[in-house]
Amino acid sequence: MWIKNISLKHYRNYEEAQVDFSPNLNIFIGRNAQGKTNFLEAIYFLALTRSHRTRSDKELVHFKHHDVQITGEVIRKSGHLNLDIQLSEKGRITKVNHLKQAKLSDYIGAMTVVLFAPEDLQLVKGAPSLRRKFLDIDIGQIKPTYLAELSNYNHVLKQRNTYLKTTNNVDKTFLTVLDEQLADYGSRVIEHRFDFIQALNDEADKHHYIISTELEHLSIHYKSSIEFTDKSSIREHFLNQLSKSHSRDIFKKNTSIGPHRDDITFFINDINATFASQGQQRSLILSLKLAEIELIKTVTNDYPILLLDDVMSELDNHRQLKLLEGIKENVQTFITTTSLEHLSALPDQLKIFNVSDGTISINEKKATD
């Protein structure tokens, strides 16, 4: 899979931009605060209908305007797709091949992406919500039903929490009805996550073993707030533990267990990776990203698009080499950087773009078809 071109209208500091890409490597070079990250964010947004930097769509709109449009042509093994996202004060419209998509789960997955940004280094030591977001984005791209089930779970969770916060005399019968619905959707969310982590663990360990020059093994554990013995019993245990938590939940006025409380833990040679060195943690995240690429390829039969936002300078030559070896010619890759000096072992087939104050121009001397 690769994105052939993109058109931006009123996106961040871009009033208008149209760019044709190389199917291999695309490098965006320029000083800080010129729009390099904004451009990669636009590709990410076109794929996932969300930014990795902000929850507010208003921040994506050029200061002179009130609407945004991003369009792109994607080439897949199954054919060409035209993607279109429009944001306005009236709301959001997503289209695939000019047809409106009623549900988020109908749109996401048309173009798959893997993002590697500086904030990803917080996946090891950061808040559990970062790791849950990582799971939700990855699983959502390869299993559309996951997004629907997660959305339903969050809807019932919000109902349950609102009821607990606003009701002085809780009706246990009504609470049990909400428990049933929460356990239905939540158990499926946990099952999807559990399966994904098992597959990710196997693939990431292979990459980490190579990157660490065969010195380290990586393992990833799903840490559920629900105690269960096997996948078939998740719903039963979830429902039972929800019932047991009624008194606590009524007192605290929120739902204390469920996938919204879950986490993942990383181990290097059986030692919690929060105690690992910065170099080891960088290798871990790099291994995760390479594993994401392979898992998406396995499920969808198409390689995802790789977005490397200002991370090459964070990697030494050894890790850069392993990253570029891992993607080879199969993965269309976008790199932002302030200088080419940080980059090593670049392939012959690439395009280099200059970015300056919301304007993109091709570097003719260094671009190849």
Curated annotation (Swiss-Prot):
Biological classification of the source: Bacteria, Bacillati, Bacillota, Bacilli, Lactobacillales
Function: The RecF protein is involved in DNA metabolism; it is required for DNA replication and normal SOS inducibility. RecF binds preferentially to single-stranded, linear DNA. It also seems to bind ATP.
Designated name of the protein: DNA replication and repair protein RecF
Disulfide bond entries: none
InterPro entries associated with the record: DNA-binding_RecF, DNA-binding_RecF_CS, P-loop_NTPase, RecF/RecN/SMC_N, RecF_2
Residues that bind ATP: G30, R31, N32, A33, Q34, G35, K36, T37
Subcellular location: Cytoplasm
One Pfam family in the UniProt entry: SMC_N
This protein's UniProt keywords: ATP-binding, Cytoplasm, DNA damage, DNA repair, DNA replication, DNA-binding, Nucleotide-binding, SOS response
Origin: domain of life: Bacteria
A molecular-function term among this protein's GO annotations: ATP binding
Gene Ontology BP, a term: SOS response
Residues annotated as transmembrane: none
Organism: Streptococcus agalactiae serotype V (strain ATCC BAA-611 / 2603 V/R)
Residue ranges the record marks as coiled coil: none
Family membership: Belongs to the RecF family.
A GO-annotated cellular component: cytoplasm
